[in-house]
Amino acid sequence: MEGKTVIVSLLLLSIVVGQIQVEAKSCCPSTTARNIYNTCRFGGGSRTLCAKLSGCKIVSGTTCPKLSIPEVTGEAVNEYCKLGCSFSVCRAITTLQNTDAGEVLNEAAEKCNNACSTLCTKNSIETA
Protein backbone atom coordinates (compact mmCIF):
# COMPACT_ATOMS: atom_id res chain seq x y z
CA MET A 1 0.00 0.00 0.00
CA GLU A 2 2.87 2.39 0.79
CA GLY A 3 4.34 1.81 -2.66
CA LYS A 4 1.11 2.95 -4.31
CA THR A 5 1.04 6.06 -2.12
CA VAL A 6 4.59 6.96 -3.13
CA ILE A 7 3.81 6.45 -6.81
CA VAL A 8 0.65 8.55 -6.63
CA SER A 9 2.51 11.27 -4.72
CA LEU A 10 5.29 11.38 -7.33
CA LEU A 11 2.76 11.48 -10.14
CA LEU A 12 0.92 14.42 -8.57
CA LEU A 13 4.20 16.22 -7.91
CA SER A 14 5.30 15.81 -11.53
CA ILE A 15 1.96 17.18 -12.76
CA VAL A 16 2.28 20.25 -10.52
CA VAL A 17 5.89 20.87 -11.59
CA GLY A 18 4.87 20.45 -15.23
CA GLN A 19 2.14 23.05 -14.81
CA ILE A 20 4.57 25.52 -13.25
CA GLN A 21 6.99 25.16 -16.16
CA VAL A 22 4.24 25.54 -18.76
CA GLU A 23 3.06 28.87 -17.33
CA ALA A 24 6.02 30.76 -18.80
CA LYS A 25 5.51 31.69 -22.44
CA SER A 26 7.86 32.84 -25.15
CA CYS A 27 6.59 35.81 -27.16
CA CYS A 28 8.22 36.47 -30.51
CA PRO A 29 7.81 39.51 -32.77
CA SER A 30 7.76 37.50 -36.02
CA THR A 31 7.54 34.03 -37.50
CA THR A 32 11.26 34.15 -38.28
CA ALA A 33 12.05 34.97 -34.65
CA ARG A 34 9.79 32.09 -33.54
CA ASN A 35 11.59 29.68 -35.90
CA ILE A 36 14.98 30.82 -34.61
CA TYR A 37 13.81 30.40 -31.01
CA ASN A 38 12.38 26.92 -31.66
CA THR A 39 15.49 25.76 -33.52
CA CYS A 40 17.71 27.04 -30.73
CA ARG A 41 15.60 25.30 -28.05
CA PHE A 42 15.55 22.07 -30.07
CA GLY A 43 19.33 22.29 -30.25
CA GLY A 44 19.54 22.34 -26.46
CA GLY A 45 19.82 26.08 -25.86
CA SER A 46 18.39 27.54 -22.68
CA ARG A 47 15.22 29.63 -22.79
CA THR A 48 17.18 32.74 -21.86
CA LEU A 49 19.87 32.25 -24.52
CA CYS A 50 17.39 31.38 -27.26
CA ALA A 51 15.18 34.36 -26.39
CA LYS A 52 18.21 36.67 -26.53
CA LEU A 53 19.37 35.30 -29.88
CA SER A 54 15.94 35.39 -31.50
CA GLY A 55 14.60 38.64 -30.09
CA CYS A 56 11.78 36.84 -28.27
CA LYS A 57 10.77 37.55 -24.67
CA ILE A 58 9.91 35.11 -21.90
CA VAL A 59 6.80 36.26 -20.03
CA SER A 60 4.79 34.71 -17.24
CA GLY A 61 1.16 33.97 -17.95
CA THR A 62 -0.51 33.13 -21.23
CA THR A 63 -0.78 36.49 -23.00
CA CYS A 64 1.99 38.16 -24.95
CA PRO A 65 2.40 41.92 -24.61
CA LYS A 66 2.61 44.01 -27.76
CA LEU A 67 6.22 43.74 -28.85
CA SER A 68 8.20 46.13 -30.93
CA ILE A 69 10.37 44.38 -33.47
CA PRO A 70 13.91 44.50 -32.12
CA GLU A 71 16.85 45.32 -34.29
CA VAL A 72 18.79 42.11 -34.76
CA THR A 73 22.46 42.84 -34.27
CA GLY A 74 25.29 41.15 -36.08
CA GLU A 75 26.47 39.67 -32.80
CA ALA A 76 23.17 37.82 -32.28
CA VAL A 77 23.27 36.51 -35.84
CA ASN A 78 26.85 35.30 -35.35
CA GLU A 79 25.97 33.51 -32.10
CA TYR A 80 22.96 31.83 -33.73
CA CYS A 81 25.08 30.81 -36.71
CA LYS A 82 27.72 29.28 -34.42
CA LEU A 83 25.10 27.46 -32.35
CA GLY A 84 23.31 26.06 -35.42
CA CYS A 85 26.53 25.05 -37.14
CA SER A 86 27.95 23.40 -34.03
CA PHE A 87 24.72 21.52 -33.40
CA SER A 88 24.15 20.25 -36.93
CA VAL A 89 27.73 19.67 -38.09
CA CYS A 90 29.63 18.79 -34.91
CA ARG A 91 26.87 16.83 -33.15
CA ALA A 92 28.10 13.35 -34.11
CA ILE A 93 31.64 14.10 -32.93
CA THR A 94 30.38 15.61 -29.68
CA THR A 95 28.14 12.59 -29.05
CA LEU A 96 31.09 10.24 -29.51
CA GLN A 97 33.26 12.52 -27.40
CA ASN A 98 30.83 12.24 -24.49
CA THR A 99 30.84 8.43 -24.53
CA ASP A 100 34.32 6.93 -24.31
CA ALA A 101 36.41 9.47 -26.12
CA GLY A 102 40.10 9.77 -26.43
CA GLU A 103 42.15 12.84 -27.06
CA VAL A 104 41.67 12.54 -30.83
CA LEU A 105 37.90 13.07 -30.53
CA ASN A 106 38.39 15.97 -28.13
CA GLU A 107 40.65 17.66 -30.65
CA ALA A 108 38.27 16.89 -33.54
CA ALA A 109 35.30 18.37 -31.65
CA GLU A 110 37.28 21.50 -30.81
CA LYS A 111 38.41 21.94 -34.43
CA CYS A 112 34.85 21.47 -35.66
CA ASN A 113 33.52 24.13 -33.29
CA ASN A 114 36.36 26.48 -34.24
CA ALA A 115 35.55 25.96 -37.93
CA CYS A 116 31.92 26.91 -37.27
CA SER A 117 33.04 30.00 -35.41
CA THR A 118 35.39 31.01 -38.23
CA LEU A 119 32.76 30.38 -40.90
CA CYS A 120 30.11 32.44 -39.13
CA THR A 121 32.47 35.29 -38.28
CA LYS A 122 33.91 35.38 -41.82
CA ASN A 123 30.40 35.55 -43.30
CA SER A 124 29.40 38.50 -41.13
CA ILE A 125 32.59 40.41 -41.91
CA GLU A 126 32.14 39.96 -45.67
CA THR A 127 28.50 41.09 -45.66
CA ALA A 128 29.01 44.04 -43.30
UniProtKB/Swiss-Prot annotation:
Subcellular location: Secreted
The species this protein was found in: Urtica ferox (Tree nettle)
GO CC annotation terms, alphabetical: extracellular region
SS bond partners: 27-64, 28-56, 40-50
Gene Ontology terms: biological process: defense response; killing of cells of another organism
InterPro entries hit by this protein: Thionin, Thionin-like_sf
Keywords: Cytolysis, Disulfide bond, Plant defense, Secreted, Signal, Toxin
Expression tissues: Expressed in trichomes, that are stiff epidermal hairs located on the surface of petioles and leaves.
GO molecular function: toxin activity
Pro-peptide positions on chain: 67-128
Stated family: Belongs to the plant thionin (TC 1.C.44) family.
Protein name in the entry: DELTA-urthionin-Uf1a
Tree of life domain: Eukaryota
